[in-house]
Amino acid sequence: MTADGVPKLKRDVRRSVDSDFSFINVKLSVGETASVRLELCGAYYVAENMRAVVGSESSPRTAAVTVEDGKITLSSGGSTVYRGSEITLMRVNYNESAGWLQLFCSGNANERKYLGNLVFRINDDGTLRVINNIPTAHYLYGIVPYEMSESCPIESLKCQAVASRTYAFGFTMPGDDYDITDSFNYQGYRGYKPGYEKCMRACVETTGVILSVDNEIPLAFYGATNGGETALPSHLFGYDSLDPLYEIRLDDIDFYEANPACRQNLEITYGEISDNEAFNALLCREAKKIVGSSVRLISILETNVNTPKFENCERNMANVDVRILVGTGSGEQEVSFGFSADRLKAEGVFTKNYKMYWGEPTSTGYNIYFCRYGHGLGMSQYGAQARAREGQTYQQVLKFYYGKMKLTDVCELNPERPFAYSLNIKAYGEFNTTNVNLRSGPSASFTSLGKFNTGTHVDVINAVNGWICCIADGKLGYVRGDYIDVKLFPSPIAAQQRVCEAKTTEATALRTSPSQYAAEIVSLSEGAQIRVWFEIGDWYYVRIGHRSGFVEKSKIIIGDWFIIDLHAIVSSQIGDGIRPRP
């Protein structure tokens, strides 16, 4: 949407309601530059090499991203974190409370804070392209507070969240590596700014709610006001392909109950002249054309705003008809004439940049209105606020403004759910000794991200060269494998566990964790029959008899995988012993 409220229709793209709407990719305006600077106030990692990069609000981690010789380099603290053709800086935990990063560049994104992940790629001209891969609800954090405000009723903020979510996915761009940009043509995404608690609540509480038409995502336009009547896209764009999604409706609540600062009134009292000198001068100029000489306006006798600009409009008018009494050199004379309503703005009667004229009789004369701040398509933001103040729910408000669209539940993960990690958890464990260093990479030469004590809970992600990649206290890092005891594994979906029968190819050891440094549980001879349950990095978690532990993948030959029903196994072992009697 442009600064004056007129949307630019770049592409008409449809996305199915069966899609996953959990994330959106936003191209950020960083300027034509080959380098940007970052300050990280949270736990991040580089997806390409799983190196941790951690900062805090009290002690931000400074980093630089630069393009040189066709490669991108991420550096921090005087050393290179990663260099490659692409860099993806991922958050460990998507929760808002887990921190953010701040971007410093030459474009509009300068000094803005961002949630989600950042992807860095190289444009054809050698400059950086930066894409914010962000949970959709968090993307809306950078839209809703600026389209409305924290003081608005919560139900109107929910309306804005749903409309903005629909608009974003209705405008996505196929074939590009991003869905939408942060420009004002596409809602003007402004990143993350703490403090808009009610606006953010509206974004989260409408997670997974979107407007659809025939199971596809439409372009859901919205604007400040409609001036008392909604419009059709053809009124603005000149073609009618989107008209079936919208309808012309009178909206008295928008006009009479919404912000009166979004219109100008010309109050006419019959039998008198107007208080608006520009209007009086306009009438005299038109009367002079008829009379043939200069005239003096004595009074306005009748006024009417008429002639719909478009079919079926009742309040978007093109012409003004008047009957006035003027004084001439030879006496008084009644004069009737009409003129284009657009002249009211052109000749200074009205001074604002509104879009629509209409009028109505009053007990003493007639009022002419100049209104509609925006395009009039879809939801009126001031109208939504007024309806919410009257007690309407966001569903009721959206039904009025988007009557030909359907509120639909879609797949969208809530980024504020507990432990909204960007990585799949393979197992759960705890540290088995004190003063354990969590390091930024898989060796003792990497920076320590902090020390932890015995019993500290960890979420296991992977195993690399004897080191375990894990999350401790919200930070992603590495710990040598013998310092972690693996305790539990995530429950399989619907208790359907994928397993396989296998055997060892040489003598090896069953260990307590996926690391050659871990303690040996028992020695296994060549050809030992085992059952494989899980895998972590280069290790399998297996069972042999009554024992379980980890064996290196390279020491095992596996058979076909199959599914076992854990519920059925437990039920068969329990029998009828705990079932209620009839």
Where are these regions (language model features)?
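Catalytic zinc-binding patch centered on the HExxH motif and its immediate surroundings
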Residues: A502
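Conserved, single-site charged/polar hotspot
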Residues: M1-W467, I471-Q496, E506, S525, ...
